[in-house]
Amino acid sequence: MRKRQPVGRSRKSSLWKAVLGAGALVTSLAACSGGGGGTVINLYGGASGIGFEKIIADCNQQAGGRYKIVGNLLPSDADGQRDQFVRRLAARDSGMDLLGMDVTWTAEFAEAGWIRELTGDQKTMATKDTLGPPVQTATWKDKLYGIPRTTNVQLLWYRKSLVPTPPKTFDEMMSMSQQLKSAGKPYEIGLTAAQYEGYVVNINNLVTAEGGTIVNSDSSAPTVDDKTVKALTLLHRLATSGLTSSSMSNAQEPEVFADLQAGRSAFSLNWPYVLSAMREANPKLVDDLGFAPYPTVNAGDTPKVTLGGMNYAISTYSKHPNEAFEAGMCMRNEKNALSAALDAGDVPALATVFDRPEFIKAYPMKDVLLTELKNAVPRPVSPVYQNISTVLSTQLSPPAAINPQASANGLRSAIQAAIEGKGILP
């Protein structure tokens, strides 16, 4: 799940469709003209991040005129991005060269033959000095299909003036929240539960916290069991506790962040970008903003949260695959990965960036991030992941309506049907 990319900064709208259509037209013209005869590398995905224009400019300068990277707009939510990718790649569109892909798409796109395997020197270069978990997100059937650019895990953010000692478990957090509410203080627990990919991340977090999984190791069958029932029980408790936002079932990352920024939340389960975003949105609150590992279900457990992030993949239909690879490597090199981390809050996949003094200063939660990354778990790795994700977000929405045992039973059947490709639109 990338922050504010794979799990969305905003909802899809007709405006986005209009912008996308115009962007596609501009891209088509640029690809044909080549900007005066040169090679154009069309980048889709991640091109609109804060400060990213200077990364593109840097890499274009380094290319020395051999090619020019052109960033193209996509919808800012993961589902909208995937929809555009699928439609254009299925049509063998050669106007897409470099794809900024959510980590959950690797298996699907590789199995469909839409992205190129990286072998030999390219594989060595793409994995050198790269954290292990991000490399795994770019891998399918032991083959590498992407350049890991960013990675991501959620943290617990909290108000230090309200919560001197952060909770370690969900029960502790709910108890603290209730005490704050009773005292007439800000108390809300912020988390994403709208019907979209960010909600699936939280579902996966809770199932994993209970020691369960959603599907088996090869994603061929659901593993919905008593651990899933326990996770759904906790999710229902949260949704009906009176301790979350009244709009929890419509909340994506921006809404969860806004509640924290406005002082309504005492606790917020969100991605690392929160700190850099808060420095811009509400500098006065930054000193009161604390961070801690994601809560566990049982005291003493190690937090195991869902892995997010973005990889650069090269389209099978690109006419310039070598230049596209070079462009991708440049945009995620140590200098530019650090720039994205400082400007946009993008957690780098490159291990070397974590040792840079500038990064350490900007990311006081560095050690928590590394520990969580070490123990992070993926969402179901499957060519039909989108089907599974759709089932999870629809069957369990809204969370307040969950009936743990009955919902688990329905989920089991629906996931099996999704795996078999029944009744789900691609």
What annotation goes with each model-predicted range?
Residues 2-107, 298-300, 417-426:
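Conserved N-terminal structural module of periplasmic/extracytoplasmic solute-binding proteins
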Residues 86-87, 95-97, 125-158, 301-305, ...:
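A structural signal for short loop-to-beta-strand junctions that line the ligand-binding cleft
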Residues 120-130, 190-193, 210-233, 280-284, ...:
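Short, solvent-exposed loop/beta-turn-alpha elements that line the ligand-binding surface or hinge
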Residues 176-177, 183, 219-249, 294:
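Glycine-centered hinge/linker elements that transmit conformational signals in sensory
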Residues 240-243, 280-344:
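Extracytoplasmic/periplasmic substrate-recognition and gating elements
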